[in-house]
Amino acid sequence: MNFSRSADLFKQAQNSIPGGVNSPVRAFKSVGRDPLFIKKASGCKIEDVDGNQFIDFVGSWGPMILGHCHPQVASAVKAAVDSGCSFGAPTELEITLAEMVINAVPSIEMVRMVSSGTEATMSAIRLARGYTGRDKILKFSGCYHGHSDSLLVKAGSGAATFGVPDSPGVPQDFARHTLTADYNSLESVRTLIAENKGQVACIIVEPVAGNMGTVPPREGFLEGLRTLCTQEGIVLIFDEVMSGFRVAYGGAQEVYGVTPDMTTLGKIIGGGLPVGAFGGKKEIMTLLSPSGGVYQAGTLSGNPLAMTAGIETLKLLQAEGFYRNLEEKSSYVAAGIARAAEKAGFPIYSARVGSMFCAFFSKDPVYDWTTAAKCDTEAFAKYFRLMLGEGIYLAPSQYETAFVSIAHATEDLDRTIAAAEKSFRAL
């Protein structure tokens, strides 16, 4: 494959954009090559500026559950543009999408739209602090909740990719209010709560950790968090920016039967456009301005383009058998890749929840950040480059999740499995 145009654009970009990209993981540093510059996408395929076409398992980092450029969503957004892109004023579309989200997600009685997942988690934490009158928050090592200062402490995702668990520029005063427990370890949570009795405002957790690969919750973990939070008057926040509407229509809380006090959501509720949301119990949400004293605002929050895309996306997700079909596709490709590795005698640990999956380059089970960090990232980087050469586009980091869309046909999945067999043999 020829990547010369992408290489030229990356050189040019570095003169005007820090690092040449607008989000660090896009730089491909951890996989030892220059990034691709994408020209267009449709269904499960993306095409770069050199004309190379790839089967896409990144899906804009999760939200493209329908595949790229779904005609029903694209048509609705094009029509919405003709009426205006942004008004900075209420629209009926906001109410429609809010009601759809409330009907879908068990924990959400009221919801506030924002423009990103980072905004959603940042605002949810501010609201939890306002509700409880407490300052400290508890998160988990390897879980990423956006790039706000309070949450860039032992984070996963991009921070894990670059080996920087804490970012320069985050004041110690912020960091000292953030407690960090081990994912899937209730004991570590109990210890921190006991040491900070009556001071913890909220526990924020990815119910399916998707920013250190794909790490499911162990049996009893989410239930244990729910019990602890109820006992201690702590707000339980599920960060479902990745898992919401992805692993089930009602998210991971539907799958595992555990209802948090608040939930954050991301771009999937806007069909991949810039959007996020946070919602929860009415008694908490009514503390938000203008009905309450906890301030949160955004000029583009609830903008008509994102709301339109979200409404059409959620309509399509309600189709009979949608998630059953998606589950079959996801199970098929994840199992096929695992078999390919086994056939080649290459040790991997395969994990999957719904249409989120990860091939960990480790012979041992992965259940938290400590075990994830033991993965052979150099071997993954080689695998990534080999798969790219075979026309398969994976996330450029061992610590990211792969996403299957409803647009992936059996022939796409078979081609992916065949590419994996060839790549594992070459390692």
Swiss-Prot record:
One cellular component GO annotation, for this chain's record? cytoplasm
> Can you tell me which family this protein belongs to?
Belongs to the class-III pyridoxal-phosphate-dependent aminotransferase family. HemL subfamily.
Q: Which Pfam families does the entry link to?
A: Aminotran_3
Pathway connected to this protein: Porphyrin-containing compound metabolism; protoporphyrin-IX biosynthesis; 5-aminolevulinate from L-glutamyl-tRNA(Glu): step 2/2
Q: Which InterPro entries match?
A: 4pyrrol_synth_GluAld_NH2Trfase, Aminotrans_3, Aminotrans_3_PPA_site, PyrdxlP-dep_Trfase, PyrdxlP-dep_Trfase_major, PyrdxlP-dep_Trfase_small
Q: Which residues form the signal peptide?
A: none
Q: What's an example of a GO molecular-function annotation for this chain?
A: pyridoxal phosphate binding
Q: Which HAMAP family match?
A: HemL_aminotrans_3
* Cofactor(s) this protein requires: pyridoxal 5'-phosphate
N6-(pyridoxal phosphate)lysine modified-residue sites: K267
Organism field: Geotalea daltonii (strain DSM 22248 / JCM 15807 / FRC-32) (Geobacter daltonii)
Under what name is this protein listed?
Glutamate-1-semialdehyde 2,1-aminomutase
The protein's matches in NCBIfam families, at most eight in alphabetical order, are given as: hemL (TIGR00713), PRK00062.1 (NF000818)
Location in or out of the cell = Cytoplasm
